Amino acid sequence: MSKNHLLQDPFLNELRKEKVPVSVFLVNGIKLHGIIDSFDQYVVMLKNSITQMVYKHAISTVVPSRMVKIPAEESSGEEEGTVAD
């Protein structure tokens, strides 16, 4: 697993599991709202009144509507982190 996935995947997965509403800012400035339904290496499925497939390379920022705990990876020896809005 690449280094950036050590934060990205647990963060997105926690948002998905807890159904936290998010604002997703794209690199062109467009702001999307919704709940992360699923994601993979290349895309995030963002659900609102419809489900949108958003390519990760087009995403600038993901802002959760509330604080989210990111579970620490057991093998990394790092502390559990939090991300605040």
Curated annotation (Swiss-Prot):
SUPFAM superfamilies per record: Sm-like ribonucleoproteins
Gene Ontology molecular functions: RNA binding
Annotated keywords: RNA-binding, Stress response
PROSITE patterns attached to this UniProt entry: SM
Pfam families linked: Hfq
GO BP terms, alphabetized: regulation of DNA-templated transcription; regulation of RNA stability; regulation of translation, ncRNA-mediated
Superkingdom classification of source: Bacteria
The keyword RNA-binding is assigned to this record: yes
GO CC list: cytosol
Sm domain residues: 9-68
Purpose: RNA chaperone that binds small regulatory RNA (sRNAs) and mRNAs to facilitate mRNA translational regulation in response to envelope stress, environmental stress and changes in metabolite concentrations. Also binds with high specificity to tRNAs.
UniProt-listed PANTHER family: RNA-BINDING PROTEIN HFQ
Database matches in HAMAP family: Hfq
Family: Belongs to the Hfq family.
Name assigned to this protein: RNA-binding protein Hfq
Lineage: Bacteria, Pseudomonadati, Pseudomonadota, Gammaproteobacteria, Legionellales
